[in-house]
Structure formats: C-alpha cells, structure tokens
C-alpha cells in the first residue's frame, strides 16, 4: 500500500512540474527580452534562501519568492528532483508570475 501511495505522490509531482513548465513558457512569451538577463540572475541567486532575503531589499516586488521558498526548498530536496532544470523552471515561474499578475 505504501508503494502505491508513493507512486501516486510522484505522479502528482510530475504533473505539477509539467504544469509549471507550461506556465513558465507562457509567461516567457510575455517577458520583454531586456528582462531575461535579470530573470536568469534572479534564478541563480534565488537558489540560496539567504540571497532571496537580500533580493527582497533590492526588488521589493519579489515577496512571493519569500512566501514560497520553504515549500520550494522541500520540493527541491525531494527525490523527484532528479530533473536538472526543475528549480529554474519553478523560480522563473515565480519571478515572472509575480511580474505579470
């Protein structure tokens, strides 16, 4: 029974990951080209939670990263995260979603 539950959780996470990727692609279509270098810089710095706090001072509009970072860090440390670019998709999704909504 435990194996089935674990498998179901993995499937759910894979589905959520695909949804995030689609969301990111849609948001990237609306992201001005001049903003993309800033976004990739934010992605690389956001991987360290201490840096996220520093970034909040520079870009106050990025509050959503702070609110979601605990859940994301749990996701990133989980076994499903053998996908190399998962964190980039997620953080870009958050950064861009925050810009546009």
Curated annotation (Swiss-Prot):
Keyword Transmembrane: yes
Keyword set, alphabetical order: Membrane, Transmembrane, Transmembrane helix
Residue intervals passing through the bilayer: 58-80
Primary subcellular site in the record, as a coarse category: membrane
Membrane topology designation: Single-pass membrane protein
GO cellular component: membrane
Taxonomy, superkingdom: Eukaryota
Subcellular location: Membrane
Miscellaneous comment text of the record: Partially overlaps HXK1.
UniProt name for this protein: Putative uncharacterized protein YFR052C-A
Species of the source: Saccharomyces cerevisiae (strain ATCC 204508 / S288c) (Baker's yeast)
